[in-house]
Amino acid sequence: MDLKTAEGNPGVLSIIVLTYNRKRLLRGCLDSLFSQTAPRESLEILVVDDGSTDGTEEIIREISLRYPDLKYCRQAHKGIPVARNTGIANASGNIIAIVADDYLLAPDYAETITKFFRENPGAMVVRFKIIAAEDDFISRVSHFYLDVGVRRRLCCEEISEESWLKSLKKKWQKLPVVEEQITTQHDLEAAGGAAFKRGVFKTVGLFDESLLRAEDTDMTRRLRAQGILVYYYPYHQIRHRYGRSIFATVSQCFASGRNRWRYYNKYSNDSVDLFRLAGWRIKEKIGALLSAFWRARQAGSVREFLLYLPFMCLFETSTKLGFFWSALLSKKKGADSTGRS
């Protein structure tokens, strides 16, 4: 998939909206984008539909009556990385931002991006702070789980399998309060409504379409390998709408675990045998429990700790099970291939 031009149209910001079977959320996201304070001629809003079957196409036709400059690309259901790449290939701006359909963007989102790159001409990538859009319990507990991970990565705190049993005391401690400032000293992905200068994709390539969801982690790894910094800009907040049930978060955690395995498998040269898988199973269970306790420990009070702990255990267990399940399937697939040969 080739980019149209190396630089794109100067002065144009392309905002790609990724969607799949979430027409209700998409409508809210687009309403927020078409309420931007930036001049309309400086914006290109492009929806990439990853093969929705819920009537998304009809919603787009309806919205296009109000916003005729809305662009729409529909593809067969191939996953988020392919949708990202489809959007990039069809975008014309020299700056490309990618947002999810469950985001609500503040009116100055586009202006914040263009102003940031104007004031920081050497920057190539910037991401923003994600907050919960609603204050219901499901949104609070789901966001807490993700936000603790963000805070850890802002502190560059690693929670690796090797460190769990060696530094339990340290991992039980609460994370330090991180002063909110523009920084590149973090371990965050180029996600969170991130905006890229178009030339980035000429340098490091497009998103890896084999990873399904861990493509932003992989992209960030390739960016850093080329010396391209990811700026974190916490002064602009993007509101994230979480699912209506706790099971939506559980499902996302399981999918996240599965894709962690795919990412691990891409960069690991180790062969995986059944003995190691059995060992992983034990470590994953222990790790899920310890990580859940650690996340709940970041709560502001004993009451919140006790309230959040069961959900942290549920989310962490789902993530670890997803990782182990993908590892097991990979091993089985490898064994089947060997047997056929």
Where do the model's predicted regions map?
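A conserved acidic beta->alpha catalytic loop
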Residues: 32, 49-58, 100-104
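Conserved donor NDP-sugar-binding/catalytic core segment of glycosyltransferases
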Residues: 108-157
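A short, conserved alpha-helix in the catalytic core of glycosyltransferases
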Residues: 188-196, 200-205, 210-237
